[in-house]
């Protein structure tokens, strides 16, 4: 209870302080400013909606016009682009390992970046689900069905895609929890799964296009938000969503890129932008775009949209992202051993 109270209190304090920060940041007639949000693959629609709301609020409260530009791609590739010089004011990536790389490899953010915003700097969560053709013709119900002969599985490349790493680890976690499960049996299971993968796209949106637009595959391993968006856009008569018996808690984090905002003089606006994600308005937009909101009241309002599912965490099952990355996704790790270099 104490932990839940402290998180709610931190969220309330952050939301309360948002308006004051905006009013102090700029005066009427301040020069227009542009921010660059470098994000992972399937967040286009989410941030288009958030950007529209934030810039309107900022203009009303400060008198300053803001344009927020977006860059999207596989989370790992986006992190590498920032390290290599892409001038991101904020990074909103698919997993903590990719954000931490901005500190470890680029020294662009401080080591304690994860503590600067509530919920480990992750203003929303998601999980991994199965997207299948209408009527589920291959009768895919759980992870074990993905290794059956004749089942074509679509998932992106975990070398470049954050969502693909969540997919991979969710499958591994399920296999670990089967009778007699251990790392050896989990590796054997995931190897069989990847034998059923006909193509590896570089990011989650590319994999969705392969499955939905190109008609390849029987099941797409997808972010829950991406699956719900695809079903909405195509209509309920085209696709079904299957919730597996176990999945993984995905917590995509956000951060200001300190070295960039200090050089460009955009820190106040960039920080206000990320804090906006935690406001009631921001959390409503997050839920409307099929991400699971952190705000308890908003989460309760959208409970029917997000069914309950048993979730494992990266820390409890894999010892955190550093260990998971080294074991599974670095050169020579389990993915390379399974799929070939």
Name these PLM-found stretches:
Residues 135-141, 160, 173-181, 260-268:
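Short helix-loop capping/hinge motifs at secondary-structure junctions, enriched
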Residues 38-40, 113-122, 132-134, 144, 152-179, 194-197, 231-248, ...:
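Short beta-strand->loop
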Residues 261-341:
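Extracellular/periplasmic juxtamembrane helices and adjacent flexible linkers that interface
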Residues 1-17, 24:
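N-terminal secretory signal peptides and thylakoid transit peptides that target proteins
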Residues 127-136, 251-268, 285-289:
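A bilobed periplasmic-binding-protein/Venus flytrap-type ligand-binding module shared by bacterial periplasmic
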Residues 178-245:
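Ligand-binding pocket segment of bilobal, Venus flytrap-like solute-binding proteins
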Residues 31-160, 339:
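N-terminal segment of the mature folded domain
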């Amino acid at each position: 209870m104490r932990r839940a109270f402290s998180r709610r209190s931190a969220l309330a304090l952050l939301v309360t302080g948002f308006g004051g920060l905006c009013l102090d940041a700029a005066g009427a007639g301040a020069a227009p400013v542009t921010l660059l949000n470098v994000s992972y693959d399937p967040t286009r629609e989410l941030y288009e909606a958030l950007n529209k709301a934030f810039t309107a609020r900022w203009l009303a409260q400060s008198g300053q016009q803001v344009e927020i530009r977006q860059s999207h791609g596989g989370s790992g590739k986006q992190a590498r682009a920032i390290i290599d010089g892409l001038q991101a004011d904020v990074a909103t990536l698919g997993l903590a390992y990719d954000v931490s790389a901005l500190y470890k490899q680029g020294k662009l953010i401080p080591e304690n970046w994860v503590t600067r915003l509530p919920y480990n700097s992750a203003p929303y969560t998601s999980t991994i689900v199965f997207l299948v053709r209408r009527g589920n013709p291959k009768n895919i119900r759980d992870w074990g069905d993905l290794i059956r002969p004749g089942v074509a599985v679509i998932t992106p490349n975990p070398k470049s895609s954050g969502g693909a790493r969540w997919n991979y680890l969710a499958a591994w976690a399920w296999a670990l929890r089967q009778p007699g499960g251990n790392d050896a049996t989990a590796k054997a299971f995931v190897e069989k799964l990847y034998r059923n993968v006909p193509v590896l796209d570089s990011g989650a949106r590319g994999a969705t296009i392969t499955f939905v637009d190109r008609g390849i595959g029987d099941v797409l391993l997808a972010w829950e938000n991406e699956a719900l968006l695809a079903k909405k856009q195509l209509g309920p008569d085209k696709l079904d969503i299957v919730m597996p018996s176990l999945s993984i808690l995905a917590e995509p984090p956000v951060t200001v890129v300190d070295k960039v905002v200090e050089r460009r003089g955009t820190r106040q606006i960039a920080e206000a932008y990320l804090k906006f994600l935690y406001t009631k308005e921001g959390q409503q937009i997050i839920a409307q775009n099929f991400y699971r909101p952190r705000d308890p009241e908003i989460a309760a309002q959208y409970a029917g949209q997000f069914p309950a599912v048993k979730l494992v965490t990266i820390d409890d099952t894999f010892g955190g992202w550093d260990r998971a990355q080294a074991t599974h996704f670095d050169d020579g790790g389990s993915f390379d051993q399974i799929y070939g270099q």
